[in-house]
Amino acid sequence: MLDILLLRKDLDSAVARLETRKKPQAFLNVEAFQSLEAERKSLQTRTEELQSKRNQLSKQIGMLMGKGEKDAAEAAKAEVGSLKTELDQSATRLEQIQGELQTMLLAVPNLPHDSVPVGADESGNVEARRWGTPKTFDFEVKDHVDVGQPLGLDFDMGVKLSGSRFTVMKGPIARLHRALAQFMIDLQTDSHGYTECYVPYAVNADSLKGTGQLPKFEGDLFAAKKGGQDGEPVPDNAALYLIPTAEVPLTNFVRDVVVAEDQLPIKLTAHSPCFRSEAGSYGRDTRGMIRQHQFDKVEMVQIVHPEKSYEALEEMTGHAEAVLQKLGLPYRVMSLCTGDMGFGAAKTYDLEVWLPAQNTYREISSVSNCEAFQARRLQARFKNAQGKNELVHTLNGSGLAVGRTLVAVLENYQNADGSVTIPEALRPYMGGQTLLKA
């Protein structure tokens, strides 16, 4: 959530920056904001006047009583009672206005950092660097579906059990998928200093509100009503949501917490399934594992000092890149433009891995600095050197999406006979195997 003081101080500048993002007209109703702010200011001024008058009358009552002027004192008491009624009405309306402003701000995305390229959509993204050279094959390249099905990828069973965009893995490919996740989590903990966490896969609305998925993106989530306890009926609003990413529970570790400055940075990682409705993705990537309702991901989260967050962004991007480098998968790093960034991000890098069957790079990781946007919703703070509470900055990134990494391994390491060479980094997790074959 944006700092309302920033909007009060320089609304025009904030709106200009918001207008560089996707669908700017949906972000902030400037006229409604200004109207509420004008009413708030007027009410606050009137409230202060009433409080001052009440205080003066209260002093007068004591003086009048001391002088024995009982009738005048009673008249002053009556006026204080009248002022209290008006003060109560003002306080009620002020609370309503604050609630309306809060609701309005919950729908407003983060402001892009000055270094973010301006663009309307993904065509405006800028390549920062690339690593590795795509392999040249001397046979017809198959996509991951054709490579993976003989090895245990079962899309028909996924449809039978759950519907479209679900996949079943069996045998050697299931083991390779597990090996990838284990390799990633070991790399992030052993080499990069993250603390491994096991998190709930269902969270409450407050958690999703804190990280920015609610209330604006409820349609992207899977909701499940909580079961009643001891035969009690279930309230309509007693919902849990399946996590769209482990970023949600990990970042919420610091909700309503004040940490000591010397505890920063806090570096957390988790391997979890992720659940997404993929609303708005009808007809896109319908073949294979690229876009699924359920997929595994190793997530990285850092909670840092505000002055260190852009340094942390570069570090985290490097941590995601390390996975691809150790697997020998060619990739490029893209700096997302203003029109392609996620709702809560101030700056984002996407890692895109080379997929030979598509002859292109596809997203496999996003790493974002949210600055204080999530922390303000979460009230996640640290005590600074002056002893004052200050909002932390939060960052999150994929390290990596396991399913898409499996896709990249199958396509980049395929052989003419249908087998798949297992990358060296994964062989310790595969019992020393060098080949995956049916």
From Swiss-Prot:
Disulphide connectivity of cysteines: none
GO annotations of cellular component type: cytoplasm
Positions of ATP binding: 276-278, 363-366
Top-rank taxon, per record: Bacteria
Protein's UniProt keywords contain Lipoprotein: no
Record GO terms (molecular function): ATP binding; serine-tRNA ligase activity
Cellular location(s): Cytoplasm
Coiled coil: none
Record-listed E.C. numbers: 6.1.1.11
GO biological process, one term: seryl-tRNA aminoacylation
Catalytic activity: tRNA(Ser) + L-serine + ATP = L-seryl-tRNA(Ser) + AMP + diphosphate + H(+); tRNA(Sec) + L-serine + ATP = L-seryl-tRNA(Sec) + AMP + diphosphate + H(+)
Residues the entry annotates as binding L-serine: 245-247, 299, 398
Pathway assignment: Aminoacyl-tRNA biosynthesis; selenocysteinyl-tRNA(Sec) biosynthesis; L-seryl-tRNA(Sec) from L-serine and tRNA(Sec): step 1/1
Keywords on record: Aminoacyl-tRNA synthetase, ATP-binding, Cytoplasm, Ligase, Nucleotide-binding, Protein biosynthesis
Similarity comment: family membership: Belongs to the class-II aminoacyl-tRNA synthetase family. Type-1 seryl-tRNA synthetase subfamily.
Subunit composition and interactions: Homodimer. The tRNA molecule binds across the dimer.
Cited function: Catalyzes the attachment of serine to tRNA(Ser). Is also able to aminoacylate tRNA(Sec) with serine, to form the misacylated tRNA L-seryl-tRNA(Sec), which will be further converted into selenocysteinyl-tRNA(Sec).
Matching PANTHER family: SERINE--TRNA LIGASE, SERYL-TRNA SYNTHETASE
Domain comment quoted from the record: Consists of two distinct domains, a catalytic core and a N-terminal extension that is involved in tRNA binding.
Record's protein name: Serine--tRNA ligase
The organism of origin for this protein: Delftia acidovorans (strain DSM 14801 / SPH-1)
Gene: serS
